[in-house]
Structure formats: structure tokens, C-alpha cells
């Protein structure tokens, strides 16, 4: 368990390698399971990767696509991760995949209802593709919040970041550790510094990504691009 680190000089080569690894995992997992489930992270960073994955010649009709996390906003909003996946991943060949939303089409102000909706519709992913912020957060598990530390068995947790906008729904540490594999994609010198600190210091309260990298339950394959 723990992690494996793969380093690349640029993002193009990094995404190429990650795309090949994704294909390998996808095809191998389908041999073991009748249907596979894969969760994707949002944000601006993975757009080019999502576009590359969307054109892969895979058995997408046997794949369930879900989100690692989502902001509690209308799913047509530009900051919505749901919109991001529909715009960049669920296109081309990947349009044949089925999408499992974290939020209903009509967003209410009742966060408990949204929390219940997300957990009721949750399907445990075989693979989750993660990103990481310069503050060490992953999914929507942020520093100085308690959501990622709880030992309860919810698959989806409600988080309220201190230094980021919007309340969010996020896969819990428990759900992430129940994946067969995790991929972490990061780039840039600053994030490399955060990664190295997380690898040296298992301090999940200040660096949530450390909780994942030091997991005894799941291996994280880290794809790092220098530029």
C-alpha cells in the first residue's frame, strides 16, 4: 500500500502516461467486474486529461462515472464539477458511460437533504482520480477541518472550507480507501514541495493528502509533472 511516484518533465508527457495507465486499469478491472465505477475530481487542472480520456476506445457503456467531490451550487454553474465532467469528459466515446450525480437537478437549501441524496446514490468507485491543492487538500477534504478525520462510515461527507468558496460534498477518507486504486495528478514545483512534505510528515490535519498517501488500505499512484 502507500504510494508510487512517477515523474515527468512536462504535463503533456504526464497526461500521456496517465492516460495509458487509465486504459490498463479500465480493461483489467472490467475482466474482474461486470461493471466498473470511476470517480473524477473537478477543478481546472484536469481539463486536458479529461479530453484525452473522452476519446479512448473503451467499453464506456460498462462504466459508471461519478464525482470525487462537488460544490453545492447549481449544476449549470461554471464552478460546478458536474458541468465540468459533462463539458469535457462525457463527450465523444465516453458519452456512452452512465453518470451518477452527487447533487439532484434542483438544488435545495436543505444541506441535510443533499447529504442524504449523495449517500443514497453513492456507488463505490473502483478507481478515483485525485488532484491536490497547494494547501494539501484533496477531494474537498481541506486542512483544519474535521470531515476527513472522522472514523464514521459515511461514503460522502459535507465540508465547509475555511479558505475556499462554497459548501461541498466529498468522498470521505473511508470511501477513498475502499477504492481498488487511486491516481493523483499534480504539476509544478510548489505542489512538489507540498507532496514531499506530506510524504515525510503524516500530518493529515494540516495536509489532508498525507492521510491518503500513508494509507495502509489503498495504493496511490502519483503522476507528477515538473512543468
UniProtKB/Swiss-Prot annotation:
It comes from Helicobacter pylori (strain ATCC 700392 / 26695) (Campylobacter pylori). Signal peptide: none annotated. Keywords: Hydrolase. Pfam families: Glucosamine_iso. It comes from the Bacteria. The keyword Hydrolase applies. It catalyses: 6-phospho-D-glucono-1,5-lactone + H2O = 6-phospho-D-gluconate + H(+). Pathway: Carbohydrate degradation; pentose phosphate pathway; D-ribulose 5-phosphate from D-glucose 6-phosphate (oxidative stage): step 2/3. Belongs to the glucosamine/galactosamine-6-phosphate isomerase family. 6-phosphogluconolactonase subfamily. Hydrolysis of 6-phosphogluconolactone to 6-phosphogluconate. This is 6-phosphogluconolactonase. The keyword Hydrolase applies.
